[in-house]
């Protein structure tokens, strides 16, 4: 059996945390031969609820769960962490502007970035799930001196999976037959799910669906899926978000399938003309614990326009965060 790895999870008593932790402990994220130590972070007022989650984790008697810690101190939760899933974030309340949300979450992710830099492993892999995820990841890496910014990522895997599911439904195929789906940009309504490179059973997706469906139905459905779930369920996506987080880390750690890629939001290094520094979703492949942006894809005018709109939104968020003194 391998030596255990340490996985820190914030917001651990929340809805996503509850859907996430048991699957990590069962080996679904890092493999059935990889023991894990879970280091769970919550705010003081949620510690009682977290105690209950810890009891349930113990009661599952997972063979791969090598240790369990619950705390309200980021420096304890992130100590020697190999992976950090930053799920906890302040939710948007009625009457709140996005700027207000950035300010409240800015404080959380500033503190967590600093704590990661201070106590986590130097090669810790960080996934930000808490929204606004892309800009929260930016704040975290800008406040984590000594850690590689490339190891800070934000989750667009849920958008990627939603896009695959919608295309599969439309074409009457299984999601496993769909390859090379791409989501560009921000995890927000400006995201751009790109079908120009996608394949269904080896055939170009746009041979099977028409442009009108793509533009008028597919793009808005994927972009607004989160809101549709809130409307139907009275609560935001939890199980599907947890599933996406597991797949994001699994593929990053264990590698992407041959001949395919996934979508991850990562600090831009200027790929495809996207401004450097913003955390932007790209198509990526991963191998041996390192990811690479897929380069050389042809970008047409339709795609370029949408890629620029979502990049501009992220630049605006970065400016707001700078004005608030968070980076």
Swiss-Prot record:
InterPro entries: L-lactate/malate_DH, Lactate/malate_DH_C, Lactate/malate_DH_N, Lactate_DH/Glyco_Ohase_4_C, Malate_DH_AS, Malate_DH_type2, NAD(P)-bd_dom_sf. Gene3D superfamilies: Lactate dehydrogenase/glycoside hydrolase, family 4, C-terminal (3.90.110.10), NAD(P)-binding Rossmann-like Domain (3.40.50.720). Changing residue 190 to I: In strain: F428; produces a 2 to 3 times higher enzyme activity. PROSITE patterns: MDH (PS00068). One of its GO terms (biological process) is tricarboxylic acid cycle. It holds the Pfam family Ldh_1_N. PANTHER family: MALATE DEHYDROGENASE. This is Malate dehydrogenase. Keywords: NAD, Oxidoreductase, Tricarboxylic acid cycle. The lineage of its organism: Bacteria, Thermotogati, Deinococcota, Deinococci, Thermales. It catalyses: (S)-malate + NAD(+) = oxaloacetate + NADH + H(+).
